[in-house]
Amino acid sequence: MAAEIIDGKAFAAKVRGQVTEHVTRLKEEHGITPGLAVVLVGEDPASQVYVRSKGKQTVEVGMNSYEHKLDADTSEADLLALIDQLNKDSEVHGILVQLPLPKHLDEDLVINSIAPEKDVDGFHISNVGLLGTGQKSMVPCTPLGCLMMLRDYHGSLSGLDAVVIGRSNIVGKPMAQLLLGDSCTVTIAHSRTKDLPEVVRRADIVVAAVGRPEMVPGDWIKEGATVIDVGINRIDAPEKGEGKTRLVGDVHYESAAARAGAITPVPGGVGPMTIACLLANTVTACCRANNLSEPEGLTA
């Protein structure tokens, strides 16, 4: 059987359309424009690309975009002072500090200085705790995007067996919490899990977020399972020419697609959903800040 391809680009466009509708409604009915502030420290090329893309998409959905670009040698005190200023700014509903930060800055300290209600990345320890106890929180963008795609494909996830491969604070752990919240039976697996192939073969849903190129072969996948591949790995591609590379996920796509019922490609699967969910979180944060009903379909 050939798996159905879950098109992340198309789904992200749908989410951005929903965000645009909510932003328009907030402007017309309440005179409120959601605002997202992105802080970039240093000149990391990949981070610069991400920040430009976030700013562009923020404006396209009708929100205000505030970019703060700081020198790589910016002191921790100056960065914390900027975040404090943004925390107090009523025009700013979401704050994102682009990671990684230069080594002299304490990432945990910086992230936890963001007001939890404006932490649209969902990394603040308060949001982590709220998610872990099943309470209303800001949810990390990548797991939220995965959950949206799974709900769209399956409808109800209740009772399904899910395996999350990877235990990071950014994807693995929050993904498991979200699946638990939707009444899945969840296993968190990782590189040291005993008999990992058999663990994965039992799963109706496989979320791979371990950061190892093509680690999961197709024969680990249960017939008809849904595969969400969060991995983005660049590997050599000599078939394209000397020095050429290509992007692959944590799952071997061709062999997995032959067995799965549905699968996300890399690229074009989970990746586009991350920024779309950042925009969704910003609208959610804006609604909460103004005691308005939250947008349906854009939250966990």
From Swiss-Prot:
Its EC number is 1.5.1.5, 3.5.4.9. Keywords: Amino-acid biosynthesis, Histidine biosynthesis, Hydrolase, Methionine biosynthesis, Multifunctional enzyme, NADP, One-carbon metabolism, Oxidoreductase, Purine biosynthesis. InterPro entries: Aminoacid_DH-like_N_sf (IPR046346), NAD(P)-bd_dom_sf (IPR036291), THF_DH/CycHdrlase (IPR000672), THF_DH/CycHdrlase_cat_dom (IPR020630), THF_DH/CycHdrlase_CS (IPR020867), THF_DH/CycHdrlase_NAD-bd_dom (IPR020631). One of its GO terms (cellular component) is cytosol. The keyword Metal-binding does not apply. It catalyses: (6R)-5,10-methylene-5,6,7,8-tetrahydrofolate + NADP(+) = (6R)-5,10-methenyltetrahydrofolate + NADPH; (6R)-5,10-methenyltetrahydrofolate + H2O = (6R)-10-formyltetrahydrofolate + H(+). GO terms for molecular function: methenyltetrahydrofolate cyclohydrolase activity; methylenetetrahydrofolate dehydrogenase (NADP+) activity. CDD domains: NAD_bind_m-THF_DH_Cyclohyd. It holds the Pfam family THF_DHG_CYH_C. The keyword Hydrolase applies. One of its GO terms (biological process) is methionine biosynthetic process. Pathway: One-carbon metabolism; tetrahydrofolate interconversion. NADP(+) binds at G166, R167, S168, S191, I232. Homodimer. Catalyzes the oxidation of 5,10-methylenetetrahydrofolate to 5,10-methenyltetrahydrofolate and then the hydrolysis of 5,10-methenyltetrahydrofolate to 10-formyltetrahydrofolate. Belongs to the tetrahydrofolate dehydrogenase/cyclohydrolase family. This is Bifunctional protein FolD. The lineage of its organism: Bacteria, Pseudomonadati, Pseudomonadota, Alphaproteobacteria, Rhodobacterales.
